[in-house]
Amino acid sequence: MAINIEIKDRTENPIYVQVRQQIETHIRNKTVTSGESLPTPAALGQQLSVDKGEIQRAYYELEQLGLINKHTGKDFLGKPKIEYRVK
């Protein structure tokens, strides 16, 4: 899933707040639909050239707001795999 997020350097809001607000807007505007997977924190962090910890914090806050769910499963090698999906 590709979502359009822009990070602004000259703002009072930290990066994780900018990410959270923009994803929240996409969810509320139905740009992303219920059940749709979000990019992993590592993938989105790389796409935006920011630390994945910023994305993890944004996802955590979205989860606390009840907008996304965190799903833990296993990949084809049996390693733990975490997915974030829109509620």
What is the role of each PLM region?
Residues 1-38, 43, 49:
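Extreme N-terminal segment that seeds HTH/winged-HTH DNA-binding domains in transcriptional regulators
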Residues 16, 59-60, 84:
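Aromatic side chains
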Residues 21, 64-65, 81:
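Short linear sequence elements within intrinsically disordered, low-complexity coil regions
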Residues 30, 35, 66, 73-75:
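Glycine-centered flexibility sites
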Residues 37-69:
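N-terminal helix-turn-helix
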Residues 38, 70-84:
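Short, Lys/Arg-rich nucleic-acid/phosphate-binding segment
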